[in-house]
Amino acid sequence: MIHRRQPTRNRTGWTSNVPNELTQCFIAYSKSVSRPVLDIGAAFGVATIPALAAGATVLANDSDPGHLASLEELTPPLLRPQLQLLPGRFPHDFDIPAQSLAAVHASNVLHFLTGDELMAGFQLMARWLAPGGRLFVQAGTPYQQPFAAFVPVYEARVAAGELWPGWVEDARAISTHRKLNQIPRSLHLLDEAVLNRLVTLAGLQVERVWTYRRHDLPRSMHLDGREGVGLIAYT
């Protein structure tokens, strides 16, 4: 498959037509579930459609209804009965019954949330997961070429013990990347320690957390191999 990146309609970056490594773990897990799974920030279905094909019932969430309309059109007709569309911005606009989900997938969406929103969001995801359920998270870190100038600031905040060392109020103040208009003004670049803390406070157990370079990441984003952070946790 030829890799393509497509800008999101709501200017929250880009979506890929190739699942990243964390998303591949979610898709593989979807083959074994009996309860529905949730895909937060589903965009055009790079995770949702393969999870449907794996046999799962998928609640596809996105803050842009146009994304969900496109996702539904792209879903093969035989799989559409397994698809439930869930419009709204996480973690504010929708709720799901407690302990009803086998898995939650959130790839390249949590780094647009404030610290308070992350705290609320992890509490919700933990509540929604059934016993034995899995959480799959992928997010951007400060270690990306467009944000290289921010790394010393971030590392100083880490050393000072700040709770949210990767919070960037205005991305235009730390980067001159030519496509900054495709992302929100504020970003929350995440790391292993912050995700570990959020998971623990939500009452989940960490199975694995690691930094890596996604195979679908453009060369213009490459810095030192720690451009992304992945997390798998369980109830």
Regions found by a protein language model. Give the residues of each.
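Conserved alpha-helix/loop element of class I SAM-dependent methyltransferases that forms part
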Residues: T15-S34
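Class I SAM-dependent methyltransferase "Motif I" SAM/SAH-binding loop
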Residues: G41-A43
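Class I SAM-dependent methyltransferase SAM/SAH-binding core
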Residues: V46, P50-H92
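A conserved beta-strand element that flanks and buttresses the S-adenosyl-L-methionine
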Residues: H105
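Acceptor-substrate binding/catalytic loop of class I
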Residues: L113, K179-A193
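A short glycine-rich, Lys/Arg-flanked "PGG" loop and its adjoining helix->strand segment in the class I
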Residues: M119-P131
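Conserved class I S-adenosyl-L-methionine
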Residues: F136-P165
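Conserved S-adenosyl-L-methionine
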Residues: Q205-H215
